[in-house]
């Protein structure tokens, strides 16, 4: 972090059923601790866990996301913007169509490496023998599992067919789907509802920035994190 000049990292937290008023934590990170690049993730837990989010929590969460979006616009107008990871949205130079379909690429484009050299699709699968891909010495030996993760894309999930946000989440997180449905190709519906709300807020902020010159002037701009092909995201086809 020091080598990057104190940039390029996120202060990340997790909210549960016990703290659905998560903006309090985010504003504490920003106002009291001085962090400007923030993220707050909803917990994914067994339905019988006391920490698990419930359907009754959703209206409160939606209010929190709207509160956060409006407060971010206020801060931006004051020249003191903060970044919320899930509101980063570039409508002109977004991910290429390949990334919009395939998502994070867990198990195929990247893997988690444990301290003892084992390979897993991502950190959320570490320790589960059924999801061990191989090791750093022998490489990927469980090719059947790797091929199964290749199918983790937006078109492999029938429930995604009519969702307006499907090309922004690419079908969602395989680990979350497994924990919620028992299948990496399943659909974590609760997570879908939360994701769509975040997208609505991100789009609202984009509209506000275009309508208000002050907001546009102080907008935070992001560079693409993909250097594979150089194509413009929304229309380009990845050549990797």
Language model regions located:
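Flexible mid-to-C-terminal extensions adjoining Fe-S/redox cofactors in radical SAM and related proteins
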Residues: 126-240
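Radical SAM enzyme [4Fe-4S]-AdoMet core and its adjacent flexible, acidic
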Residues: 3-110, 128-132
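Short, acidic, Ser/Thr-enriched surface-loop or helix-capping motifs
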Residues: 114
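Proteins with a high burden of low-complexity, intrinsically disordered sequence enriched in S/T/G/P/A and R
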Residues: 1-5, 28-32, 172, 230-237
């Amino acid at each position: 972090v020091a080598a990057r000049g104190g940039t390029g990292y996120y202060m990340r937290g997790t909210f549960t059923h016990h703290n659905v008023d998560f903006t309090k934590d985010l504003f504490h990170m920003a106002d009291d601790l001085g962090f400007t690049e923030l993220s707050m993730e909803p917990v994914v837990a067994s339905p019988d866990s006391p920490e698990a989010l419930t359907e009754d929590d959703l209206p409160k969460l939606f209010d929190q996301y709207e509160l956060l979006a409006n407060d971010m616009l206020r801060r931006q107008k004051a020249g003191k913007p903060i970044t919320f990871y899930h509101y980063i949205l570039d409508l002109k130079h977004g991910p290429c169509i390949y990334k919009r379909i395939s998502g994070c690429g867990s198990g195929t484009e990247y893997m988690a490496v444990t301290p003892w050299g084992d390979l897993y699709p991502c950190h959320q699968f570490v320790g589960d023998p059924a999801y061990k891909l191989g090791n750093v010495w022998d490489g990927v030996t469980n090719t059947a599992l790797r091929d199964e993760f290749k199918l983790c894309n937006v078109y492999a999930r029938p429930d995604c067919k009519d969702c307006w946000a499907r090309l922004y989440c690419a079908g969602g997180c395989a680990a979350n789907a497994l924990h919620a449905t028992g299948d990496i190709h399943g659909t974590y519906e609760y997570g879908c509802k939360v994701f769509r709300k975040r997208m609505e807020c991100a789009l609202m902020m984009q509209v506000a920035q275009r309508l208000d010159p002050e907001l546009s002037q102080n907008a935070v701009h992001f560079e693409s994190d993909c250097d594979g092909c150089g194509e413009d995201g929304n229309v380009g086809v990845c050549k990797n």
